[in-house]
Amino acid sequence: MLNNSPLYLKQDMVIRDEEYCRKNGLMGMSDTQLKAYPNAWRSWPRNYGGNYGDNSDIPLWNGLARSLNTIAIRVGDLVGASNIFNFVYNTLQLNTLDPVNDVGLAQMVMGSQTHGVTPTALAAAFQIFYDGQYTTPHLYTRVLDRDGNIYLENNSTSYQALTPDTAYVMNRLLKNVLYSSVGTAGGRYPNSNGMEAFGKTGTASDEKDLWFVGGTPYYVTAVWWGYDAPYDMTKTLGKQQAKTRTCVMAWKALMEQVQADLPYKAFPTSAGVVERRYCTQSGLLAGGSCTSTAVGYYRADDLPGTCNYSHAAAPAAAAPAETAAPEQAVIPADTGNLDTD
């Protein structure tokens, strides 16, 4: 059971109910006292704030926008922890990950890794949600001597990490974090000549590490907020303030400054992706009896079926209320490119 609750720290271990263990044959009177984590047999994962959800159906765009751990773990379980690890380690070059200890859902989905990743590596990884291309990160291109001769040259490499179809669908999914009313960074997109953006928030369970990765048609930026000596930032900020007034606001201010004089640019679309209205109750393409619909983005060769339900019950998840741009609720991207085993 402990293996299903992987996020406990060793210092959290306490002695549990020995009488219960003895009655159930788990230990004898002469056994050394057993130790287990608090609530070791609880359900896992929990969402930020400690809840497990309400057992209602939630479309993927909503779970991602709200940063629900339960939805993320479910998707990660479908893809497979080893497939995710192989993709991010080999294709996205996140080489600070541990091939022995970091192949698991807690590590790959929740970020509970042995050493973690750097902001540079994280920004490089998120660049694939522009057009699917990955370029090795570098801090300079070339160094010239006083005569104009090349003294140093950084030869970065580029390759296709995702198909353009998958990259565009993921781009639309991540846009909801900033533009949907339920997004963890809802309304905090840069005001940059009408250019769109995408992003993802991240918060450690002890509020000692805050993250935001944001992308625009020009830049991808990763922001980490914390202390060299880890400190619980909710001691000076509330939980919501820690999430919404730190990384994402710093990123928003930076993007508005660096993009102030840049001409308008749009994210590239993909000819293999189509827009369709879908039923927010069933997740299927909207049928004639669907009363609550939203726009989804789908691979043209992988459309879901059409909904034919009567919809007598209340909606499972309402259509997203946008904070600015038109609604952009989307369905999962193709995960076939992650199958690198």
PLM regions: where:
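Periplasmic/cell-envelope proteins involved in peptidoglycan metabolism and beta-lactam response
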Residues: 4-13, 82-89, 105, 253, ...
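Mid-domain, small-residue-enriched loop/turn segments at the edges of structured enzyme/sensor domains
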Residues: 29-47, 80-124, 137
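Conserved catalytic neighborhood of penicillin-recognizing serine enzymes
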Residues: 2-84, 146-176
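C-terminal catalytic domains of large/alpha subunits in multi-subunit enzymes
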Residues: 75-78, 86, 93, 281-285, ...
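A penicillin-recognizing enzyme superfamily signal
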Residues: 3-12, 62-66, 115-322
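Long, low-complexity, intrinsically disordered segments
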Residues: 325-341
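Thr-Gly-centered strand-to-loop micro-motif
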Residues: 74-75, 111-112, 199-200
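Extended, hydrophobic alpha-helical segments in both membrane/secreted and soluble proteins
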Residues: 1-3, 23, 71-72, 84, ...
